[in-house]
Every structure is written in structure tokens, then in C-alpha cells.
């Protein structure tokens, strides 16, 4: 019984570390101006949900298109920082992440909060819902 509990605890901490690493990889991709690489953490599916100041967007490509429109160049993109406030396992298949985002830009800094829902799809953790404000 102790082995099973230890194995489960190890698996959970490993999954949490994977989630944290994926978010860090997003930050690094953004900071090099690579929106496509930034989007690799998102579920490449028409059911991806992104909620922002303009409302709800469904779909990976539409979300990428919105990022390209809203952040057309590296000056608009700036340098991204995240402050993860909570990374919580909801089940074997889901993680919930709450944090702050901040863009340091020559055209003026911006920032806000986000919630992410990660789901394990085909043995890979992906963001299936993002609410950023």
C-alpha cells in the first residue's frame, strides 16, 4: 500500500513539474517573438476556449490569429513574466493554474491575471481553456 501511495504522490509532483515547465517554455517562446511556439502548449483543437477582454474565442487557429493581431511585433509583445499563484491537480486528467502575467514594453507595460485548465490529451498536457484579463 505504501508503494502505491508513494507512486501516486511521485506521479502528481512529476505532472505538476511538467505543467510548470510548459508554462516556462511558453514564456521563453513569447520573449523570442515566437507566437507559434508559444501556442504549442494550447490544445490544437477547435474546442480550445480562450476568454479575454473581447469575449470568448474557440479554436487554436483563431486564438493564434488573435495573438498575431493583438501583438503584431516584438515591441507590442514586450517581455513576458509569469507569477504562478496556484497549480492544483483537479483529477488524474486535469490541472488548474492561477497566476499573474506582466509584459514589460517600451510602448507601456500591461498585465493581469489568468486561469488555465490543463488536460492530459493523448498522454500530453495541453491548455484546453484560458481566461486572461
Description of each model-found segment:
Residues 64-107:
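Surface-exposed, charged secondary-structure patches
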Residues 26, 38-39, 47-48, 63, ...:
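Hydrophobic pocket/interface hotspot
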Amino acid at each position: 500500500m505504501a508503494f502505491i501511495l508513494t507512486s501516486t504522490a511521485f506521479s502528481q509532483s512529476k505532472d505538476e513539474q511538467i505543467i510548470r515547465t510548459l508554462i516556462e517554455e511558453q514564456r521563453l517562446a513569447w520573449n523570442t517573438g515566437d507566437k507559434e511556439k508559444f501556442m504549442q502548449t494550447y490544445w490544437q483543437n477547435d474546442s480550445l476556449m480562450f476568454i479575454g477582454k473581447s469575449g470568448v474565442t474557440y479554436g487554436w487557429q483563431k486564438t493564434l490569429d488573435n495573438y498575431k493581431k493583438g501583438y503584431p511585433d516584438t515591441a507590442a509583445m514586450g517581455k513576458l513574466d509569469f507569477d504562478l499563484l496556484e497549480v492544483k491537480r483537479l483529477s488524474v486528467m486535469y490541472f488548474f493554474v492561477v497566476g499573474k502575467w506582466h509584459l514589460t514594453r517600451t510602448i507601456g507595460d500591461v498585465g493581469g491575471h489568468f486561469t488555465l485548465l490543463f488536460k492530459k490529451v493523448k498522454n500530453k498536457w495541453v491548455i484546453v481553456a484560458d481566461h486572461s484579463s
